[in-house]
């Protein structure tokens, strides 16, 4: 047989490698089924539930399926199973409900709104080990509630409303190890409740427990206890709680998770029970007497059975428990310790203590998960639940916090009380950002640098009691935005700066008792949410309400006892304030020190008349309405500021003064703005069309003003014989060139200078005669009512020098009566303009009048006239005032002479002139004035012999085009006719 060649061997080797690599690759890409996944479901599931197999157990998930009764689950399972029935609607568990589910090892009934469990409801569940009843509405555990659960090891009933537990409720649960009853309403635990059980974990947080007695209660718990939680209960720290304190000193220090915080009495509120001495809790008895009276056994003299009494005694050993580890650091290099004895494992192979709502539980560790770094000379305790470290450095003789080396990791609580620390610097807490409690009490601290606690953002409790601090400033508390409890009692504090606590918005408790305070500054408590305040044993004579006590909106308790209150008028606001809060909120008495007649009397029992007699004098002046801030003997303040009271002659608070000034300022601004808007609107608003009576009234005003102007001018210029008719003053001289704006005549003066508006003597005589003759002359047939400002055209109308007839002149009163009569009889309210484009441009206006009845060439051609008292009144040739072309129109036909309202004639047809009359402008332009005078000359110069051949129309139009830049009322009258 031939041996294979080297080439064949190499080929075979390559093939083997290829096969091997292929096998490895195939193994990587092909999943290997796990034992758990390979298990087949050999049990039927129940619709609509979901089933699976985990860890050799059958899991049946029936959460949120709407079940109202256990009997609705009709399936039977022969193998051990876990049943999940969370978030259903089972209000009650009936007797023998679980008989067909006898193989269940865990049942979760959480969040079902359960209200009652009938006797024997759990019959048949002999192998059940875990029962979850959390988040229901159970209010009682009776002696027969848990019958049939002999194998139960874990019971979770948190977040219910349990108020009563009967003493035999757990007597049949001999294997119970974990009991979770947190967040219920349990006020007291009955005697011998835990006699038949051996608990390792007990959670009683968030109930209403005030005390736990030793006999029949604590003596049954401590036999195998590994973890105890008692937080968030209103513990009453008096003589009775000494039993609990003494018992806590006999169990491992780390077995207690959290603090036991005192609720009452008030001077212990917020303090840890373990930090209070027994002599303070019960000052009348010694420790041995207290223990003897309460039946607490003395510690055994044998070292083997002695438990450490306080953290400082645990100096030579390391204790490993279910939830914490204690480690002591010494000056020497620590030697390796022996492996501690492992605690007796729990009865179940699984973990026993899950979270509040999570069924799976991790097993407890017996070794610290991380290395412990503890400062030299201190004792450290590590809690497994949050990996927080408690550093105990009490009574170690430290002079500075910087001596704490090495710095611990994740320290939660740091106790440095009873040392020799004098100053606190900003750099002292550079590696303590995780602290939630810092105890610096009973040192010699007199200086705290601003921002010293800025590196402690998570700090919730700060103890600075029993030091030498004299002043509190806002900078001291910078960075303490999470602080809840602050203790400053037994210092020498004399001064608190304004807004000292404003940087601590979450502050709930503040102790300032036993200091040297005499007053509190403004805004001392602004920005805080204080619920408890202790001001006991200071030197307060009174406390201001405004700016101080008024900020205590969330106050629950306040201690004001042992202060030298001065019961005078200054105390009235304070008295009113303490009467408005609940009587339960004020701890103790508020006794007067002065004056002598009120010594040792409670401020709340003194009437206001006795406290402040001056108030009687203030209240006597009578029935004036109550003003804000007033106090009355039988009542409180009458305003929303119930504590703003100033004694007689006292100064007005600055805040009230500033507020009043602001109110006045804004009121003045709004009033001024309103007036400005009103005036502006009035200026811009156009006058509406008016009635005939309003036109007459306006005309009367203008006429009277013109008459006054005539008489004033006549008086100034004099008259012949002293009785001459007053004449209008001569027109003003034109201003010199370059000063065209220096003289601006008033429009009324210019208007009255126009001869067409001057009253004629014949008209005055006729009006006087009409007034004398009475109603007969006015109302007889054939008579015409006197027109209001009749338009008279004729040679006599334009005479520049009227006739001297003293009998025709009347007083101003007579003229006013005449104008009033004319107003009442006025019938006309419209005017039409004269047409300038007539076929005979060379005819003058006067010529047209001369030819009434047949002349048609002038501007007034076609008008017929009516002579009355020597005057001429024009009538249209047809229509209302006679025949001919219309110059004057009326609303309805009347044979009376036509009269024209003067004001409406001027302003009714030209809005711009009306606006000029209402708001005279500041100036007038010379060209407009000259144009108006030129028109006046052209229109009314007939009396001076002006004829049509002297000024042809073309020259007039050229001259007017040169002088006039804006239309005036005469131009408008010449071109357009309006009816209004």
UniProtKB/Swiss-Prot annotation:
Q: Is Glycoprotein one of the keywords? A: yes
SMART domains assigned:
LRR_TYP, LRRCT
Cytoplasmic compartment segments: 677-980
How this chain sits in the membrane, per its record, is: Single-pass type I membrane protein
Found, by tissue, as follows: Broadly expressed in embryonic brain with highest expression in cortical plate, pyramidal cell layer of the hippocampus, thalamus and hypothalamus.
Where would I find glycosylation on this chain?
Answer: 69, 597
In terms of superkingdom, the source organism counts as Eukaryota
Q: Where is this region: Disordered?
A: 326-361, 622-644, 709-735, 762-785
Transmembrane annotation, as ranges = 656-676
- The residues on the Extracellular side of the membrane are 30-655
Name the predominant localization: membrane
**One biological process term in Gene Ontology:** positive regulation of synapse assembly
UniProt KW keywords? Glycoprotein, Leucine-rich repeat, Membrane, Repeat, Signal, Transmembrane, Transmembrane helix
Q: Where in the cell is it found?
A: Membrane
LRR repeat boundaries? 79-100, 103-124, 127-148, 151-172, 175-196, 198-219, 410-431, 434-455, 458-479, 482-503, 506-527, 529-550
Keyword Ubl conjugation: yes or no?
no
This entry carries the following GO cellular component terms, namely: cell surface; GABA-ergic synapse; membrane; postsynaptic density membrane; postsynaptic membrane
The signal peptide, as residue positions, is 1-27
**Span of domain LRRNT:** 365-407
In this chain, composition skew of type Gly residues spans: 715-725
LRRCT domain location? 233-284, 563-614
The entry assigns this protein to a family as follows: Belongs to the SLITRK family.
Q: What does this protein do?
A: Suppresses neurite outgrowth.
Query: Which protein are we looking at?
Result: SLIT and NTRK-like protein 3
* Species of the source: Mus musculus (Mouse)
């Amino acid at each position: 047989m031939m041996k294979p060649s080297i080439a064949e061997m190499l080929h075979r080797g390559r093939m083997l490698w290829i096969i091997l690599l292929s096998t490895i690759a195939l193994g990587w890409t092909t999943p290997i089924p796990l034992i758990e996944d390979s298990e087949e479901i050999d049990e039927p599931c129940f619709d609509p539930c979901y089933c699976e197999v985990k860890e050799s157990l059958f899991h049946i998930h029936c959460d949120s399926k709407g079940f109202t009764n256990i009997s609705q689950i009709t399936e039977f399972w022969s193998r051990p199973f876990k049943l999940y029935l969370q978030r259903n609607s089972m209000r009650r568990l009936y007797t023998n409900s679980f008989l067909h589910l006898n193989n269940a090892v865990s049942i979760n009934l959480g969040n079902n709104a359960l209200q009652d469990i009938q006797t024997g409801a759990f019959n048949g569940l002999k192998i059940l080990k875990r029962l979850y009843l959390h988040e229901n509405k159970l209010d009682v555990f009776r002696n027969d509630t848990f019958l049939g659960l002999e194998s139960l090891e874990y019971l979770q009933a948190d977040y219910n409303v349990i108020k009563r537990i009967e003493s035999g409720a757990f007597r049949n649960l001999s294997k119970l190890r974990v009991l979770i009853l947190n967040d219920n309403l349990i006020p007291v635990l009955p005697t011998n409740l835990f006699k038949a059980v051996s608990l390792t974990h007990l959670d009683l947080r968030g109930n209403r427990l005030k005390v736990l007695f030793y006999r029949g209660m604590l003596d049954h718990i401590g036999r195998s206890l590994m973890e105890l939680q008692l937080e968030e209960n209103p513990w009453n720290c008096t003589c009775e709680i000494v039993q609990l304190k003494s018992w806590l000193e006999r169990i491992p220090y780390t077995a207690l998770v959290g603090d036991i915080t005192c609720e009452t009495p008030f001077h212990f509120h917020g303090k840890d029970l373990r930090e209070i001495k027994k002599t303070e809790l019960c000052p009348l008895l010694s420790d041995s007497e207290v223990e003897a009276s309460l039946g607490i056994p003395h510690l055994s003299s044998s070292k083997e059975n002695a438990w450490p009494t306080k953290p400082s005694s645990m100096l030579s050993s390391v204790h490993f428990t279910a939830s914490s580890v204690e480690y002591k650091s010494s000056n020497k290099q620590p030697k390796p310790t022996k492996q501690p004895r492992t605690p007796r494992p729990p009865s179940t192979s699984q973990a026993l203590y899950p979270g509040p709502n999570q069924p799976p539980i991790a097993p407890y560790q017996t070794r610290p998960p991380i290395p412990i770094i503890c400062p030299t000379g201190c004792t450290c305790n590590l809690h497994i639940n949050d990996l927080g470290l408690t550093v105990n450095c009490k009574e170690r003789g430290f002079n500075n916090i910087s001596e704490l080396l090495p710095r611990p990791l994740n320290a939660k609580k740091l106790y440095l009380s009873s040392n020799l620390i004098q100053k606190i610097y900003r750099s002292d807490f550079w590696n303590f950002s995780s602290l939630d409690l810092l105890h610096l009490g009973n040192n010699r601290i007199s200086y705290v640098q601003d921002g010293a606690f800025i590196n402690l953002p998570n700090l919730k409790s700060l103890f600075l009691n029993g030091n030498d601090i004299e002043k509190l400033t806002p900078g001291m508390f910078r960075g303490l935005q999470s602080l809840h409890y602050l203790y400053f009692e037994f210092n020498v504090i004399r001064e608190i700066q304004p807004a000292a606590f404003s940087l601590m918005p979450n502050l709930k408790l503040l102790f300032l008792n036993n200091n040297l305070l005499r007053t509190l500054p403004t805004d001392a408590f602004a920005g805080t949410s204080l619920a408890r305040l202790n001001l006991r044993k200071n030197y307060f004579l009174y406390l201001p309400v405004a700016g101080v006590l008024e900020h205590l909106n969330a106050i629950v308790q306040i201690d004001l006892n042992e202060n030298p209150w001065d019961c005078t008028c200054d105390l009235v606001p304070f008295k009113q304030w303490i009467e408005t809060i609940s009587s339960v909120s004020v701890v103790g008495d508020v006794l007067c020190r002065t004056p002598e007649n009120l010594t040792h009397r409670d401020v709340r029992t003194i009437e206001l008349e006795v406290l402040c007699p001056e108030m009687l004098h203030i209240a006597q002046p009578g029935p004036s309405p109550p003003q804000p801030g007033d106090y009355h003997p039988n009542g409180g303040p009458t305003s929303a500021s119930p504590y703003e009271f100033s004694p007689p002659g006292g100064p007005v608070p600055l805040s009230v003064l500033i507020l009043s000034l602001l109110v006045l300022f804004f009121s003045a601004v709004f009033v001024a703005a309103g007036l400005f808007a009103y005036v502006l609107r009035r200026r811009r608003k156009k006058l509406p069309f008016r009635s005939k009576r309003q036109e007459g009234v306006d005309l009367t005003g203008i006429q009277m003003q013109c008459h006054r102007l005539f008489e004033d001018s006549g008086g100034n210029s004099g008259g012949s014989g002293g009785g001459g008719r007053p004449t209008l003053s001569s027109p003003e001289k034109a201003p010199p060139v370059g000063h065209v704006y220096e003289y601006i005549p008033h429009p009324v003066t210019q208007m009255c200078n126009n001869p067409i508006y001057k009253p004629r003597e014949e008209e005055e005589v006729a009006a006087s005669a009409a007034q004398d003759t009475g109603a007969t002359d006015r109302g007889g047939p054939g008579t015409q009512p006197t027109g209001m400002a009749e338009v008279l055209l004729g040679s006599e109308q334009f005479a520049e020098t009227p006739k001297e007839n003293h009998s025709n002149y009347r007083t101003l009163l007579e003229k006013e009566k005449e104008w009033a009569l004319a107003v009442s009889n006025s019938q006309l309210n419209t005017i039409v303009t004269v047409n300038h484009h007539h076929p005979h441009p060379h005819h003058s206006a006067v010529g047209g009048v001369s030819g009434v009845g047949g002349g048609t060439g002038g501007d007034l051609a076609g008008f017929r006239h009516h002579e009355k008292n020597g005057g001429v009144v024009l009538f249209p040739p047809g229509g209302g005032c006679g025949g001919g072309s219309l110059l004057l129109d009326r609303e309805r036909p009347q044979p009376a002479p036509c009269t024209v309202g003067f004001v409406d004639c001027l302003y009714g047809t030209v809005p711009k002139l009306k606006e000029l009359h209402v708001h005279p402008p500041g100036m007038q332009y010379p060209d407009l004035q000259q144009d108006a005078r030129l028109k006046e000359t052209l229109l009314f110069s007939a009396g001076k012999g002006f004829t049509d051949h002297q000024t042809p129309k073309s020259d007039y139009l050229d001259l007017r085009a040169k002088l006039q830049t804006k239309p005036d009322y005469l131009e408008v009258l010449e071109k357009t006719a309006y009816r209004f």
